Amino acid sequence: MGHVDGMCMFKQKTWLLLRHGNKLAILRTMGQKTGAHAQGKYLMHTAFAMRPGTSHPQLGSWAQYFLGRRSRSMPDSVLIGAGNPGPGFFPPDHAPFPIGDASKGIRDLLPKIDRKVFNHRVQLAQRFSRVFEKYFPHDEVKAYAQFYDETLKFFDSKTVDAFDINKEAPKARSLYGTSKFGRGLLLARRLLEHKVRYIEVTLGGWDGMHNGMNAGEQRTGELDAPFAAFLGDLDQRGLLKETMVVLTTEFGRTPKINQRGGRDHFPGAFSAVLAGGGVNGGQVIGQTDEKGIKRAKGDKISPQDLHTTIAHALGLPVDERIHGSGGRPFFVGNQGSVIKQVFA
C-alpha cells in the first residue's frame, strides 16, 4: 500500500485495516460540543441539534427525498443493529428499514396464523384505511396508507432473500467472521448489490469509562477484521468506487486515563474515516497536538461538514433550501462545508 504519513494512529489491533490505508482518508480534527450520548448520536446522524418537537431526517431519507427511490421492491435505507429513528419531517416511506440482527434477517416475516386469516385481516385493515382516507384526505394519511401497502408487498416478494445472509457461500461468511458486526457488514454488502442506497451498521460498546483500556482494545479488535474484509470485498466486486464508506462515532475519548482506568467523553477532538465513492485515499486530513487535545493543523471539521461532504458525494443539492413541517427551512447537512481535500 505504501507508507501514509499519520497512519501511526492505527494501533496493532487494526493491522488488517492498515493494509487498506491507501483507500482511506482520515479526518483527524472532527469536533462538536456535546458530550452526551443521545445528543451526540442525534447530531452525528442528522447534522442537527436535538430539539423538542422537531424530528430531523438522516442522510438516507434526504437522499430519497432528492433522488427518489431506487426500487419499489426494496427499501432505500436500512439500519442494521440500531433502532429506527423514523423519517424525520419527511413522509413515512422515507423512514429507514430496521434490522436488529443480521443473522436473523427480517423477523416475523411470515404470519404466525393461517394465511387465509392473515389475508382477511389485511383486507379489513385496508377497508378501514380507505374510509379514514375519505374523511381525512390529507397527504400524510395517503402516504402512510401507501407505505403500508408497499410493506405488505415487500414481505410477500422474493426480494426479501437479499436480507438472508445464510444464502451466502461458506467462504464469504467465513471472510466476515461470526460477530454481530461482521454479519451486519456482510448483509450490508448484499444490500448494496441489491441497490439499497444508504446502509448503517452499528458496533456498540465503546463507552469505556471503567477499565476502558481493555474494553477499547477489545472493541478495536472486533472492528478490524470485519471492516477490512468489507473494504476488500467491495473493492474486489467493483462496488467501492460507487460506494462511500464512512466510519465514525458520536465523540472521542479523553487522551488522559481517569482514576477508574478508563477514558471519559471528549467531543472536542476525534476522527472519522472515509473510503470509496470518489474519496482520494491514502491521506490524513488535519492534525491534533502531541497530546491529542487540541487542533494543531487544518480546519476543525464539524458533523455538519461531514454530512455535507457525504451529501455532495451522493449528488444532493447541498445549497437547496426545503421546508419541513411548520414551514421551517432546512438544508441537507445543515449548511456545513464540503471537505474538498477528501476528493483532491
Give residue ranges: language-model regions:
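Ligand-binding pockets and gating/stacking loops
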Residues: 1-344
